[in-house]
Amino acid sequence: MTEKLIEQLEARINDLECQVAFQEQTIEDLNSALSQQQLQITKMQDQMKYVVGKVKNMDSSNMEDPANEPPPPHY
């Protein structure tokens, strides 16, 4: 191989190594973001279960029939 070809191949290998390093960092960043989002989703799911449970357990006697309520003051 000629000296020029060797230099070109070395430059290409160097470029590929830089790209791989950048991609590895990007993958780590995306993995971290995904992990944080999964924790947030799990927390929100737990909160939704709590709220749904509270709504289901509400005493229905607290809710009166709208027909029994007096009309608003503007009538």
From Swiss-Prot:
Ranges where the record places region Disordered: 56-75
Family matches, as Pfam families: SlyX
HAMAP family (UniProt xref): SlyX
Family: Belongs to the SlyX family.
Name by which UniProt lists this protein: Protein SlyX homolog
Organism: Vibrio parahaemolyticus serotype O3:K6 (strain RIMD 2210633)
Species lineage: Bacteria, Pseudomonadati, Pseudomonadota, Gammaproteobacteria, Vibrionales
Name of the gene this protein is made from: slyX
